[in-house]
Amino acid sequence: MFKIGDIELKNRVVLAPMAGVCNSAFRLTVKEFGAGLVCAEMVSDKAILYNNAKTMGMLYIDEREKPLSLQIFGGEKETLVEAAKFVDQNTTADIIDINMGCPVPKITKCDAGAKWLLDPNKIYEMVSAVVESVNKPVTVKMRMGWDEDHIYAVENAKAVERAGGKAVALHGRTRVQMYEGTANWDIIKEVKQSVSIPVIGNGDVKTPQDAKRMLDETGVDGVMIGRAALGNPWMIYRTVHYLETGELKDEPKVREKISVCKLHLDRLIKLKGEHVAVREMRKHAAWYLKGIRGNAKVRNEINHCETRDELVQLLDAFTIEAEAKELQDAKVG
């Protein structure tokens, strides 16, 4: 549907790079639901250069996920360039993305993430240095500005383009907003009109209809979906289908949700081992169960699970219980 450098995406729906979430197990699951591009969670440039074991694990890519964008962050040109070169030469990622959007203080105090948004000249300098050092296309994920008084989205996007960046993903919130308030799609539209490289819009795309509205109202090349896909890869499938056909597919049934949740669990166990995976899966299971009536009790029980068997037994028992309630409701209706 559109290209980032020489990488062709089959549609306009992109999975956002969410920290603590977008490992290979989650990305592959979302890819199977039709995402045109999946983005890995951000990785520290210095951690790559220190050969940190956990970080090296975060660079793992399953070939079935591709095309894939791998995101790095840092505040110093030398280390960012060296980390980008490592990713370029030692991973099968298709795209190298630079994080300029993370609003978390522990990132911004290191002059990384959203701190870049205050200086278009630094953006140009850093991006051009990375572009010159690697063969893979380089992109940037950014927010619209630091705060309401410092919104340099257009200048920053132009700096990325001038530096040789192949696309910009723009979240229509400031750093100060974090994830509160509403995303400003007008700024996204302005940025799209100001550069010739692809622009991917991000922020408040919660339904397939939102995705279409963003495309129509801003003219962006793609839509990036983040939190709406947590425990809900059907959001990706339903959005792709809606954009292609205009038809809105039904939400998944309980059994289908639990089945995919268990698949996700097993992939996470394969990736990280049972002990770590089960603990990490607690939050994912809560997301999968969201919106299913009567889930509070089982969500609480899941938070005490330590093994795969415990978690699967709880999920299976809840499925039977929830389906019985659905059947009862249907009879009453």
Question: What function would you assign to each model-found segment?
Answer:
Residues T29, A53-T55, K85-F86, C110-A114, ...:
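Short, glycine/charged-enriched secondary-structure capping and boundary segments
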